[in-house]
Amino acid sequence: MVGMDIAKYIDHTNLKPYATKEDIIKLCDEAIQYGFYAVCVNPYRVKLAKEYLSEKKADVKVASVIGFPLGATPTEVKVFEARKALEDGADELDMVINIGALKDGDYDYVKRDIEEVVKVAHEKGAKVKVIIETCYLTEEEKIKACELAKEAGADFVKTSTGFGTGGATVEDVRLMRKVVGPEMGVKAAGGIRTYEQALAMIEAGANRIGTSSGVRIVEGARNAE
C-alpha cells in the first residue's frame, strides 16, 4: 500500500491535554501536506481546527472526542458535549462507552447512551465512532459492546482511547470486524506508530487508523514501496 493510499485511512491525532494552538495548526498543516482523512482534536480545539482547515480550503475532516477518556459522564453531559463539538464544526465524534455500565450488565443504559449521541450527530450529518476501550474488557464484553454500538446506529466501533492500559491489537480488530460485519467501520487506535503496524490493522479489518504518528506511517509506506 502506497503512502498516499494509507494516508486516507488516518485520523491524524493530537489529544494531549497540553496541546497548544501552534500544535493544532501543525497537526492541520501535516494533514493537508500528507492527505490524511481527518484530524482528531479535543473539543476545545475543534473550532480552531475547522476554521484553519476551511481557510486553507483543505479536504480534511475534523473529528473530536466525547466523554473522553473515561466514558463515565452521564448521557446528558455527553449529548451536551456532542452538540457543542458539532456546533464548532466537528464532522465526526469519537465517544467513549460507559464501561462501568457495560460491566454491570446494564446494556439498556449503554445502548441508550450511544443512541443519544448518534441522534444529535446524525441530525447534523456527522458520524459517530464508539470507543469500547478493549484493554478493560473480556472477549464477551468486547462482543457485547460492538453489538450494542451496532444496534444503537453508530457508524464505527473503535478499539481504544490511547489513554487506557493498552491499545489496538490485531486480534481485537479482527474480532470487532467479525461482530459488526462489513457495513460498519472499525477504527484501530492506541499504540499504532509504524507503517507495518497500521498495515496489519487494515489487513485485520480496520478501515480507519487513529494515530499521532501519521507522518511516520506515511513515510514508512513510501520507503516500503
UniProtKB/Swiss-Prot annotation:
The gene is deoC. It is found in: Cytoplasm. One of its GO terms (molecular function) is deoxyribose-phosphate aldolase activity. The active site is at D94, K158, K187. One of its GO terms (cellular component) is cytoplasm. It holds the Pfam family DeoC. The keyword Nucleotidyltransferase does not apply. This is Deoxyribose-phosphate aldolase.
